[in-house]
């Protein structure tokens, strides 16, 4: 790595103002100031090959119209240097970028891009900067009509409609309970201040949105003197500085914008209470569904104390903290989240009670204050304090495993800078963490607990879902549109009809820009798998891969599920839910909660059923993944096995409390589950593994858990009822039996990635401990290979819809090329061309979806046509069905294809961390996934030529003709097109199907 310039040194119009370091990233930093333009640049320099650049503007929410969000969409549409219909999507679909986005926050707007190529990064930076300087969208009203808001009228007798990408996105959040809760708290806490305005509220203020207001927002906010640029990775700093100065910054004299005072000013003191009605659709639950927040303003704290409050919040969020204990002692069996929220214009400490009722507000408030008083007086248990400190340290050590790290870091720094004017967030974080973790007396924690126990300003708020209110707001919108049309003169109506026609013609134009391309010959070779070894140790199949990272490792276990039968499968969800919730033979619940934090970092359970390519591993399995310090490995594995084997399932009152607490999380009818459910419904048709996972996590699990809860409550309510006790005993017995069947050494697999000095010891201790597990259960029943999952032999429907509590739809159509040998890597760029040139224009620009496109998953062997937050089913599915034919008709130049080659290569070869790459290689080996085949496909991407068009279109036609379709969303829209589907699931109804 090249040496950074020293403080005071001047390069290309920039002067180095600060030098620092971030040890967790292995990075040195330099902050540079460009006096002429007023711009600042922070360079975070380490050996990361994935480079990142982020252009960040300080953007206070000056109103409730979501103006900054609309402006963010407009900024990267077009500019004189890069004229296009939408140059952002040109770059996204035709460049070697590994990440790209535009993101609006409550205090800043950022435009990040990442790439593995320095040349590509600078070319994309040029597009971003040119668009910021001369956005074409602020001159041509039609961009605003597309991205923000427009009115359409086909003829004088037709209905007036209101459309727009951001409006559609915001309207899709109509029933977002937590978003509505955040808004209610901010409005009450910061009434009359900018901090009260949150993003994403256009659907409540659409009558006030105008193009002129958006243009005014640009003039108020966008200047280089109100901008921070962040460069990350092993970049060529001098080349970047020269480019910035010569091509951009030297052309724009600073306007000396100073918007930070807009975030400042006194906060009204005192305690307030408020309630807000949150829209919900008819049939949505009203009981046990509210969000109750206690929000404390932290404006008076120093930056160091705000960071420390984040550590304290992490401790209070734990199940064994004084706040959580106080809540349980007062009879509150709800999930209570505690977190520091720095995404607002002012930092706040948030206590959030989930799945509550408004009558719980006072009890919740009492619990929080009781817990805070305990902490202020006594601190927290030393074991919990040190476990949370260790968990934070592990997170810091593993930060480099995060893909697109340059973006994630810069987002945090951007928020910090927008409020403070400082860029040293991570350096300050490290110093503060060192100070906090060394505070053995917990004096900082006790002091902060005392401060928030009697805060200068706080609000207790409740967001209460009101079924039917969503429909009422939609009806109000439709009534307003009818009245608006009725108020228009014949001349105005004709003008709107012409404007609608003109907009549709303009939107249908294929105008793109390719002036940012690099040559495909410059693309790197795909990397081979990192080395690993495998074999039997003490009868356990083990794989190990040496890592250069000292002191930290990643681990994975695969338990065989072949013996499970009948209701075992439903109980698997309950079994996983109860881990760390019941005493075991060696550890009480409180000990488990603390040890989980300390020894099982990011521990996740999952189910899988690899296909025939996995050979003898083509069988149902349960995976357990975790990370930790290598010195703690043996303790972590021993603890994990104790959790899994020895839960006391006689504690049925506790089991009922746990189910009651977490049951709402299994309700798939919530709108936020739409995207994942849409993928699951489609994937289950083409993949055994996906079908297996869907059946184990289907909507019916929610009803199974409700039934278990009913049985347990009946036993508690009728202790003398023998039948009730028998039914409840059966639940305990089923859980014991399941644990015996699950935790066996039969066909057990263990993977480890760790430093070479520790790896042999880890594999030896793992195989020794695991070999002591039984191979048959305690009843002596031999395990078998038979799979008896209910409905397993019933083929999934080809075309499935699911009705959930949502205003819009998620649509997916899949093409399966895994077993199609004639499908080569060179066809992948053509897939992306079809998405960019046909699907996105038809569904997003000319349709009404928030976004749409085509993606592929190379290791999984399929591609997806998708649209999100889409009010149209019929037209979108028609577009999807015609994709192959449309591709055959596209007119692509070699330069167009070059861009799609770059994008396909970036999508096929995403960056991956050191530990993750080793774990992935071993997992692929276990699953029978060939890295050689994947790399051959990736290399073949570069061989794509215009001569491949017909073969690609024919293959895509064929694959889509037999591919599955799923639609998840609004029931009314789905039922309008019910003939399109073989099966319609009504998630909120127990019977499940209509």
Each model region followed by its residue ranges:
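Non-catalytic terminal extensions that flank enzyme cores
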Residues: 2-52
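C-terminal regions of mature proteins
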Residues: 2-5, 230-233, 388-537, 541-546, ...
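His/Glu-based metal-binding/catalytic segments typifying zinc-dependent metallopeptidases
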Residues: 44-56, 167-171, 257-322, 406-422, ...
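Active-site His/Glu-centered metal-binding helix of metallohydrolases
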Residues: 71-75, 575
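Non-catalytic accessory/assembly modules
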Residues: 78-80, 133-136, 140-167, 171-174, ...
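Acidic/histidine-enriched segments that form metal/cofactor-coordinating
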Residues: 79-80, 87-217, 307-310, 317, ...
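Catalytic or ion-translocation cores adjacent to nucleophile or general acid/base/metal-coordination motifs
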Residues: 80-84, 94-96, 254-265, 556-558, ...
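A structural supersecondary motif
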Residues: 95-99, 293-295, 315-355, 597-610, ...
């Amino acid at each position: 790595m090249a040496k950074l310039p020293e403080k005071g040194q001047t390069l290309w119009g920039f002067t180095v103002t600060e030098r620092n370091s971030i040890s967790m990233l292995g990075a040195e930093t330099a902050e540079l100031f460009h006096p002429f333009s007023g711009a600042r640049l922070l360079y975070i320099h380490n050996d990361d090959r994935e480079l990142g650049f982020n252009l960040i503007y300080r953007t206070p929410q000056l109103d409730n119209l979501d103006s900054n969000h609309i402006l963010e969409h407009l900024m990267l549409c077009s500019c004189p240097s890069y004229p296009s219909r939408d140059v952002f999507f040109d770059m996204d679909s035709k460049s070697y970028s590994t990440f790209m986005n535009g993101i609006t926050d409550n205090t800043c707007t950022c435009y990040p891009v990442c790439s593995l190529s320095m040349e590509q990064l600078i070319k994309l930076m040029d597009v971003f900067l040119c668009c910021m300087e001369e956005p074409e969208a602020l001159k041509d009203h039609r961009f605003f009509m597309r991205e923000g808001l427009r009115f359409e009228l086909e003829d004088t007798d037709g209905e007036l409609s209101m459309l727009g990408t951001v409006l559609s996105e915001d309207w899709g959040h109509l029933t977002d309970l937590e978003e509505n809760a955040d808004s209610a708290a901010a409005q009450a806490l910061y009434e009359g201040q900018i901090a009260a305005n949150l993003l994403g509220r256009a659907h409540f203020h659409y009558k006030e949105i105008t193009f002129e207001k958006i243009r005014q927002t640009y003039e108020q906010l966008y200047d280089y003197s109100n901008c921070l640029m962040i460069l990350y990775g092993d970049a060529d700093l001098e080349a970047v500085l020269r480019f910035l100065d010569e091509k951009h910054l030297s052309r724009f004299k600073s306007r000396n914008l100073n918007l930070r005072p807009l975030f400042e000013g006194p906060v009204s003191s005192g305690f307030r209470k408020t309630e807000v009605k949150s829209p919900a659709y008819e049939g949505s639950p009203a009981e046990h569904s509210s969000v109750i927040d206690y929000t404390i303003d932290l404006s008076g704290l120093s930056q160091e104390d705000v960071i420390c409050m984040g550590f304290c919040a992490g401790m209070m969020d734990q199940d064994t903290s004084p706040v959580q204990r106080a809540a349980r002692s007062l009879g509150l069996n709800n999930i209570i989240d505690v977190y520091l929220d720095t995404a607002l214009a002012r930092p706040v400490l948030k206590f959030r009670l989930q799945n509550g009722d408004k009558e719980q507000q006072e009890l919740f408030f009492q619990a929080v204050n009781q817990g805070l008083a305990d902490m202020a007086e006594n601190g927290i248990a030393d074991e919990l304090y040190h476990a949370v400190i260790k968990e934070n340290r592990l997170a810091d050590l593993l930060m480099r495993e995060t893909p697109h790290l340059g973006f994630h870091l810069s987002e945090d720094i951007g928020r910090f800078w927008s409020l403070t004017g400082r860029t040293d967030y991570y350096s300050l974080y490290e110093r503060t963490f060192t100070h906090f973790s060394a505070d053995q007396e917990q004096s900082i924690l006790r002091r902060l607990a005392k401060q928030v126990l009697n805060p200068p300003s706080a609000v207790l708020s409740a967001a209460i879902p009101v079924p039917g209110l969503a429909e009422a707001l939609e009806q109000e919108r439709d009534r307003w549109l009818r009245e608006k049309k009725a108020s228009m003169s014949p001349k105005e109506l004709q003008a709107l009809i012409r404007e609608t026609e003109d907009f549709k013609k303009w939107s249908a134009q294929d105008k793109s820009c390719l002036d940012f391309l690099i040559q495909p010959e410059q693309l790197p070779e795909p990397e081979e798998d990192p080395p690993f070894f495998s074999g039997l140790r003490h009868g356990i199949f083990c794989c190990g891969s040496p890592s250069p990272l000292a002191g930290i490792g990643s681990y994975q276990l695969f338990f065989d599920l072949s013996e499970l039968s009948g209701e075992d499968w439903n109980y698997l969800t309950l079994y996983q839910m109860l881990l760390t919730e019941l005493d075991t033979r060696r550890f009480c619940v409180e000990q488990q909660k603390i040890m989980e934090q300390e020894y099982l970092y990011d521990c996740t359970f999952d189910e899988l059923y690899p296909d025939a390519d996995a050979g003898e591993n083509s069988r149902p399995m349960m995976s357990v993944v975790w990370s930790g310090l290598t010195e703690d490995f043996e303790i972590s594995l021993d603890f994990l096995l104790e959790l899994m084997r020895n839960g006391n399932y006689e504690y049925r009152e506790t089991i009922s409390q746990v189910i009651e607490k977490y049951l709402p999380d299994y309700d798939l009818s919530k709108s936020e589950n739409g995207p994942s459910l849409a993928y699951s419904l489609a994937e289950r048709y083409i993949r055994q593994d996906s079908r297996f996972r869907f059946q184990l996590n289907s909507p019916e699990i929610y009803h199974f858990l409700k039934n278990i809860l009913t049985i347990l409550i009946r036993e508690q309510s009728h202790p003398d009822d023998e039948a009730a006790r028998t039914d409840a005993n059966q639940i305990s017995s089923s859980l014991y039996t399941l644990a015996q069947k699950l935790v066996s050494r039969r066909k057990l697999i263990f993977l480890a990635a760790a430093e070479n000095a520790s790896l042999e010891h880890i594999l030896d201790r793992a195989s020794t401990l695991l070999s002591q597990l039984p191979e048959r259960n305690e009843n002596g029943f031999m395990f078998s290979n038979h799979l008896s999952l209910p409905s397993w032999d019933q083929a999934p429907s080809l075309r499935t819809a699911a009705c959930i509590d949502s205003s819009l739809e998620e649509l997916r159509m899949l093409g399966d090329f895994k077993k199609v040998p004639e499908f080569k890597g060179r066809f992948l760029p053509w897939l992306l061309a079809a998405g960019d040139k046909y699907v996105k224009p038809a569904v997003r620009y000319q349709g009404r979806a928030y976004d749409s496109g085509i993606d592929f998953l190379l290791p999984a062997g399929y591609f997806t046509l998708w649209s999100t937050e889409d009010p149209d089913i019929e037209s979108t599915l028609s577009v999807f069905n015609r994709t192959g034919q449309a591709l055959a008709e596209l007119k692509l130049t070699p330069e167009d294809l070059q861009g799609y080659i770059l994008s396909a290569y970036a999508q096929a070869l995403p960056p991956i961390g050191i530990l993750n790459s080793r774990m992935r290689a071993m997992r692929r080996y276990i699953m029978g996934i060939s890295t050689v085949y994947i790399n051959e496909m990736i290399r073949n991407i570069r061989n794509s030529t215009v001569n491949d068009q017909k073969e690609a279109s024919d293959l895509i036609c064929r694959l889509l003709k037999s591919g599955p379709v799923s639609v998840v969303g609004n029931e009314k829209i789905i039922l309008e097109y019910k003939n399109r589907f073989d099966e319609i699931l009504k998630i909120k109804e127990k019977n499940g199907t209509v």
